Design a protein with these regions (language model features):
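A glycine- and charged-residue-rich anion-binding loop/surface
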Residues: 1-231
């Protein structure tokens, strides 16, 4: 996966699946393509998968979604032009405007998590999330309904951090070292030998995360809570 650093790359088709069958080539319709390297983020950690296109001089393939299964990135595709074959070279390009919107919402999720803990108590833990280009949803543990006053405080705090225009820091380290940095790790996830620590607005938000994030908090622009419900 090259998507942390690159929005496009030259790549090679390794596997093609159509109608549940492993095939050598595909000339029309829907299919799933696995590439040798990709800038497309595969859905995980609450963040939806990237979309975009795979192109060459004679080919155009629309990628509507990307799923991650183990270490494989499954590109959900529709053939727009030409025939695609295994071992063929293509240029993989994500929809950068959509990715940027998703990325902003993911970073806003981290800031909101910190604001929730600061205003409601350190017992608050993330239980799930949905991060898309249109919105974010954040599931968390709390013993009672969040009041209107608390919601306004959380919004103000998050927007203050956004407007501070601070750079995001990414640290790749061991899980043990990440805990010394104070990184939050929830969901009961199993972590490998190396983990990725995201520091947004200095030490305001420090979490383990494999998602994509803004380089500076000002890219989020603004934050507004539209609704709060219990589940």
């Amino acid at each position: 996966f090259l998507g942390y650093e690159f929005n496009s790359t030259e790549t090679e088709v390794k596997l093609i699946f159509q109608n549940g069958e492993n095939v050598d080539c595909v000339a029309s319709g829907d299919c799933v393509i696995i590439l040798d390297k990709t800038p497309f983020y595969g859905e995980s950690g609450g963040q939806v998968g990237d979309s975009g296109k795979l192109i060459s001089k004679n080919n155009e393939v629309r990628v509507s979604d990307t799923q991650k299964v183990g270490n494989f990135y499954l590109h959900v595709c529709h053939i727009e032009k030409g025939e695609v074959r295994v071992n063929q070279k293509l240029n993989a390009e994500i929809d950068i405007n959509r990715r940027n919107a998703i990325t902003s919402n993911h970073s806003a999720t981290h800031l909101m998590h910190s604001a929730l803990r600061n205003n409601l108590g350190m017992h608050v833990q993330q239980k799930g999330s949905l991060v898309s280009e249109e919105k974010l949803r954040f599931d968390f543990s709390h013993k009672q309904k969040v009041t209107t006053e608390e919601i306004l405080k959380i919004e103000r705090e998050v927007n203050y951090e956004i407007n501070s225009a601070k750079d995001t820091q990414v640290i790749e380290t061991t899980y043990e070292e990440s805990q010394k940095l104070g990184a939050l790790a929830f969901f009961g996830e199993k972590y490998g030998e190396k983990v990725r620590v995201l520091k947004i607005c200095d030490d305001y938000s420090v979490e383990l995360c494999g998602g994509t994030h803004v380089k500076n908090s000002s890219e989020i622009k603004s934050f507004k809570i539209m609704s709060e419900t219990s589940i």
